């Protein structure tokens, strides 16, 4: 397999892996994973949002839960479909970085490291860089 095809497959794999991960998390919030889900319903996810964002005022927690859900749904679809790939990947990287930072503040640094949140954010940054404008003979 040549380098160009290998790179394209790697980018496609990263887009699909990140996109499906976002959509899986959203599906779990609405009970679509059934007994295999962690949250199983939106109320439980909202409680988790409050724990992760323990430094935020209580009145903003429902907004954060819905905003995260809407962002993850849009980013998941955008990554899989390939819509505005650079900007969607960069947005995913920022969202994951913010989530990891909130986890670190509320639970300690081990939590986002154990769940590979910063690793996923870094993968999204790499994806954004690869999706940028190309120049040169092999682009």
Where are these predicted regions, by residue range?
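Extended, low-polarity transmembrane helix blocks
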Residues: 1-42, 51-70, 74, 81-139
């Amino acid at each position: 397999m040549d380098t160009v095809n290998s790179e394209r497959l790697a980018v496609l794999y990263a887009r699909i892996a990140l996109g499906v991960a976002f959509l899986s998390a959203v599906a779990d919030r609405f009970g679509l994973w059934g007994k295999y889900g962690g949250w199983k319903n939106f109320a439980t996810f909202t409680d988790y949002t409050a724990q992760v964002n323990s430094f935020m005022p209580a009145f903003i927690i429902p907004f954060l839960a819905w905003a995260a859900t809407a962002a993850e749904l849009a980013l998941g679809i955008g990554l899989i479909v390939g819509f505005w790939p650079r900007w969607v990947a960069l947005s995913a990287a920022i969202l994951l970085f913010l989530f990891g930072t909130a986890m670190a503040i509320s639970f300690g640094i081990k939590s986002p490291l154990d769940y590979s949140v910063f690793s996923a954010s870094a993968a999204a940054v790499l994806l954004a860089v690869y999706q940028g404008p190309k120049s040169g003979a092999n682009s």
